[in-house]
Amino acid sequence: MKRGEIPKPGGGQRKLGIPTVLDRFLQQAVAQVLQKRLDPTFSEHSYGYRPHRSAHQAVAQAQQYVAQGLDWVVDLDIEKFFDRVNQDRLLGELAKRVADKRVLKLIRAFLKAGVLEDGLVSPTDEGTPQGGPLSPLLSNLYLDALDQELTKRGHRFVRYADDCNIYVQSPRAGERVMKGISAFIARHLKLRINAAKSAVARS
């Protein structure tokens, strides 16, 4: 893959891993097959990178929660999510749902391919590079454990890619949820919450 960068809305640069033409073709083919198998298993509260789901639907669901009196929101932003996905955990989750070892081997090769930057190849031991057709699907697979945990705890939430909003009745409840879910993300997903971009606030 080649390294590319685009400006981030909040400032700075977002790094992309741009696959070769052949790799993009192969990733697209694998993504189409896996999407049909994996997407029906994902949470109804997940809206990003999914067929027949949109940001407009996510906003409508959030407005419904607020109308029900859940007018405090725990706004979670996962720090450098795409760069820090634990590949072993991701491949383990994939192996639970995909039996074809050839597909698993191919995806492992995509993840471990390395990135070409300034004529040098850097290894990719963590993360799922943004810019490839498979990354959106793999990101939803990785964060499905978060969706399931939030559902198990009875939370009302909306997740769009790596941004997750949880709706609660009070700031005290929000702080409690922030602490508990941050610990879950660190312990089970091997990721961290971006404290500067995460907050409990009135909707």
Q: Which positions does each model-derived feature cover?
A:
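Conserved polymerase palm-domain catalytic core
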Residues: 1-5, 9, 41-203
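A short catalytic or substrate-binding loop motif that flags glycine-/basic-rich loops and adjacent residues
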Residues: 9-10, 22
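Conserved phosphate-binding loops in nucleotide/dinucleotide-binding enzymes
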Residues: 15-18
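Duplex nucleic acid-engaging cores and interfaces of nucleic-acid transaction enzymes
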Residues: 21-22, 26, 31, 59, ...
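Electropositive, glycine- and tryptophan-enriched low-complexity nucleic-acid-binding patches
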Residues: 27-45
